[in-house]
From Swiss-Prot:
It comes from Christiangramia forsetii (strain DSM 17595 / CGMCC 1.15422 / KT0803) (Gramella forsetii). Its cofactor is a divalent metal cation. Transmembrane segments: none annotated. It is an enzyme of class 3 (hydrolase). Its EC number is 3.6.1.9. Its main location: cytoplasm. CDD domains: Maf (cd00555). The active site is at D77 (proton acceptor). This is dTTP/UTP pyrophosphatase. It catalyses: dTTP + H2O = dTMP + diphosphate + H(+); UTP + H2O = UMP + diphosphate + H(+). Pfam families: Maf (PF02545).
């Protein structure tokens, strides 16, 4: 649908996430992948979407001097927000187990911010989805972390994997946001940018 509008533009996706890359493929939006290292440090005073907004903009800053007129850069960040704490990606097995255990039997928010940057324009959007976990046993959590190694996933889990199939009883908001990108909002924003 956007192919005609995109013919004079190049979309750069600054994400190493295979899930985000697949979303763009499924949306039929061709992207150039360009991932640059960024130190994802934020002030402890930031809460919820303030964190993801800040990080998605921060990830764009390393590209600012290189962007050409016809390019649109997309950067994003996802966190799991539970009990007034942001959970990023677990650094090891023990931390993944601890994260999932803290989510068991409760609900939490998955917040994603997406930053669209061109040479003369920047827009940030964010989306929040509430996720409800059933009570999980220690054995189930151990099994999941051992077999699925969710170390590249915010909160230490992926909704589309085994743990989501057996443990998530309901969500309020976008499923795709929990996977890593509020696709409906990304599509809408790109369409608006390309039509302006």
């Amino acid at each position: 649908m956007l192919q005609e509008l995109l013919k004079n533009h190049e979309i750069i996706l600054a994400s190493g996430s295979p899930r985000r890359q697949k979303f763009f493929q499924d949306l039929e939006i061709p992207v150039k992948i360009d991932v640059r290292p960024v130190d994802e440090v934020f002030s402890e005073h930031l809460k919820k979407e303030e964190i993801t907004d800040f990080l998605s903009v921060l990830k764009s800053e390393v590209f600012l001097n290189d962007l050409k007129e016809n390019q649109i850069l997309i950067t994003s960040d996802t966190i799991v927000y539970n009990e007034a704490k942001a959970l990023g990606k677990p650094k090891d097995h023990a931390e993944a187990v601890k994260m999932i255990s803290s989510l068991s039997g409760k609900n939490h928010e998955v917040i994603t911010s997406v930053c669209f940057t061109s040479k003369n324009y920047q827009k940030v959007l964010n989306h929040s989805t509430r996720v409800y976990f059933s009570e999980l046993t220690e054995k189930e959590i151990e099994y999941y972390v051992t077999n699925f190694k969710p170390f590249d996933k915010a909160g230490g889990y992926a909704i589309q994997e085994w743990i989501g199939l057996i443990g998530i009883k309901k969500i309020e908001g976008s499923y795709f946001n929990v996977v890593g990108l509020p696709t409906h909002e990304v599509y809408k924003t790109l369409k608006e940018m390309l039509n302006s």
